[in-house]
Amino acid sequence: MYVFKRIYHATHPDMMEGVDNETLRQRYLIDGLFQPGQIVLNYTHYERFVIGGAAPHGGAVRLPDQTEPESAAGHPFLERRELGVVNVADVAGTVTVDGQAYALAPKDCLYVPMGTKDVTFEGDGARFYLVSTPAHARFETRHLSIADAVPLERGGLETSNERTIYQLVVPATCKSAQLLMGLTILKTGSVWNTMPPHLHDRRSEVYFYFDLGKDDRVFHFMGEPDKARHIIMANEEAVVSPPWSIHMGSGTSNYAFIWAMGGENLDYTDMRVLDICQLK
């Protein structure tokens, strides 16, 4: 059986003009990531991201080997890839990397390097969000908690966007080939993320929204700055942001989200900040 649930092809901004909401969702929204007792993986042609979820139930689940092409079948999934893992549940879980077990508390992150042969996930109730990018070099496995992150305080309650950005997989804390990854938590009373918005033409980004209530939603804005569109997102759903697209959102309550980037450099500040008045 093919290892990926879905493949997301890259799109030119012209292709998105005039499309309906369902088409927009089909192109960029990644849902259904957590299925009990399974690992779900999706392949995107944006920086060759693989976006997935592991939801162990009644035993361990293992990151599958490659299945295609025939020349790679049976080879480890991370033969030429690196992996970021975040426990997005409210209970702890365990990730075992080539025989070494790492206990991940809620919101803990694990960086797993290229060349790792075996990765398993355990813990009833734990849900592990997975992000993988191609890699050219092997670095060290790193277990990172919020206490290990570089915290950036941004926004304010008066503008409804007071938040803490926790930089997890960044050069200051964890060496990687191209993966950048972090966690943003909005304070009570704040609903806007990534304000003001920005673009970064040299990398793609994926947002994963979580800690949302069952009846809450995030309105995620994307598209070219003068042709903004939105996708309404529920808890524990991801969305791909192409290099040409803005990416920001507003929720019906506060929430958290994981951002992950891949591209030609590891410079977190490589972006073009926009003025909100430029958006249409």
Swiss-Prot record:
Family affiliation: Belongs to the KduI family.
GO molecular function: 4-deoxy-L-threo-5-hexosulose-uronate ketol-isomerase activity; zinc ion binding
NCBIfam families listed in its UniProt record: PRK00924.1 (NF002091)
Keyword Metal-binding: yes
Pathway(s) served: Glycan metabolism; pectin degradation; 2-dehydro-3-deoxy-D-gluconate from pectin: step 4/5
InterPro entries for the chain: KduI, KduI/IolB_isomerase, KduI_N, RmlC-like_jellyroll, RmlC_Cupin_sf
Cofactor(s) needed: Zn(2+)
Cofactor note: Binds 1 zinc ion per subunit.
One Pfam family it belongs to: KduI
Upper taxonomic lineage: Bacteria, Pseudomonadati, Pseudomonadota, Alphaproteobacteria, Caulobacterales
Record's catalysed reaction(s): 5-dehydro-4-deoxy-D-glucuronate = 3-deoxy-D-glycero-2,5-hexodiulosonate
Organism superkingdom: Bacteria
EC supergroup of this enzyme: isomerase
Purpose of the protein: Catalyzes the isomerization of 5-dehydro-4-deoxy-D-glucuronate to 3-deoxy-D-glycero-2,5-hexodiulosonate.
PANTHER family reported for this sequence: 4-DEOXY-L-THREO-5-HEXOSULOSE-URONATE KETOL-ISOMERASE
Keywords, sorted A to Z: Isomerase, Metal-binding, Zinc
Name under which the protein is recorded: 4-deoxy-L-threo-5-hexosulose-uronate ketol-isomerase
